From Swiss-Prot:
One of its GO terms (cellular component) is TAT protein transport complex. It comes from the Bacteria. It is a single-pass membrane protein. The chain crosses the membrane at residues 1-21. This is Sec-independent protein translocase protein TatA. The lineage of its organism: Bacteria, Pseudomonadati, Campylobacterota, Epsilonproteobacteria, Campylobacterales. The Tat system comprises two distinct complexes: a TatABC complex, containing multiple copies of TatA, TatB and TatC subunits, and a separate TatA complex, containing only TatA subunits. Substrates initially bind to the TatABC complex, which probably triggers association of the separate TatA complex to form the active translocon. Belongs to the TatA/E family. It is found in: Cell inner membrane. Residues 66-79 have a biased composition (Basic and acidic residues). InterPro entries: TatA/B/E, TatA/E. The gene is tatA.
Length: 79
């Protein structure tokens, strides 16, 4: 009644998993799952780092565009 709190629930779940996949496949499945989780965490970390670096790039582009625009205005005023 309290969910999967009893040890017998876990024993039955483990037994069903062994029956479905076989004892030899379980380590391969666990390895694949672990590898997938590792790759997912790496991708999330890479995206966070990219997001941190992105505003700096945009700020530099905006500043460069403003400098270019102001130099064009000066050239028009002088010419």
């Amino acid at each position: 009644m309290g969910g999967f709190t009893s040890i017998w629930h876990w024993v039955i779940v483990l037994l069903v998993i062994v029956l479905l996949f076989g004892a030899k496949k379980i380590p391969e499945l666990a390895k694949g799952l672990g590898s997938g989780i590792k790759n997912f965490k790496k991708a999330v970390k890479d995206d966070e780092e990219e997001a941190k670096n992105e505003p700096k790039t945009l700020d530099a582009q905006v500043t460069q565009a403003k400098v270019h625009e102001s130099s064009e205005i000066k050239n028009k005023q002088e010419g």
